[in-house]
Amino acid sequence: MISVRNGNSMKRAKSSWASRMVMLLIVVLILMAGGYGYSTMIEPGLLDITRPVIVVKQLPESLDGLRIVQFSDTHIGEGYSLQQLDELIEKINEGRPDLVVFTGDLIDKFRLFTEGRERLPQSLAKIEARLGKFAVYGNHDRGGGASTYYRSCMEEAGFKLLVNESYPIEMPGERRLVISGLDDYLLGQPEEEAVWSSLEEKDYNVVLVHEPDAAAQWKTIHPLDLILAGHSHGGQVQLPFIGPLIVPPLAEKYVEGHYELESASRSRHLYVNRGIGTTRKKVRLGSKPELTVLTLRRTPA
């Protein structure tokens, strides 16, 4: 009798263990399905409006409080529509920017994006900025006819497309605000010396570039004050305690957010925007799309 009872107990224990394992498997599958649904259908549409304040002691008084709105990597196409862009533009204008900058990758797959080409510059033209709108090439803006279209689109929309050149903005006082832009480092022809030779020590110099890791080579270059970049998408997928799973070339050192860089002469700041759209796969997890409203200050608020 004792052996029979023990046998029945073991059977019940095995049955209970099997039931728990089945339930655990069901829970895991539900969580996986939920995570997939969230990362493909929800988070890609959860815009994060970040508001970094960069304090620069030597900032000209005329630039104290300057508001720069940066957006990047819209990748318009299957994963991001013109209607979504129009909604984004409303939020850009709500930020009442002094400057608006776009740091590349406007359309995801240019050859497939045919119906919206005429409308796109009309949408971008609605963006308002007191001191101007500026853009640089990204790798998706180059090749296959994209380069020519991107230039005409941005210029028709009122953006100044900067390709290895600088654009000075006269401000009250002796120091100017100078916006410079470099060509794409992956598919373009960046000419750094053409930009560096145009910069003056007395000015406040902002540099736009698509790939952020280019800035790692500029430690001895001066005078650079603020570098704005995109390209990384923040990895698109980030996991707790691990970080981004995959980042593109030239976005491995600087992935997202604000970095204070080493400089020989003055404080230098880099901000990497996570981008708006997605590429390859419409998925974001732990890396929400970002609209940056950046403010320059002489002293902390």
Report each predicted region and the residues it spans:
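Short, Asp-centered acidic motifs that coordinate Mg2+ and/or phosphate
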Residues: 98-99, 134, 159-160, 177, ...
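Conserved beta-sheet core of the metallophosphoesterase superfamily
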Residues: 212-295, 300-301
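Extended active-site neighborhood of metal-dependent phosphoesterases/phosphodiesterases
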Residues: 53, 119-191, 197, 254, ...
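Active-site environment of divalent metal-dependent phosphoester hydrolases
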Residues: 76-79, 108-110, 139-147, 165-171, ...
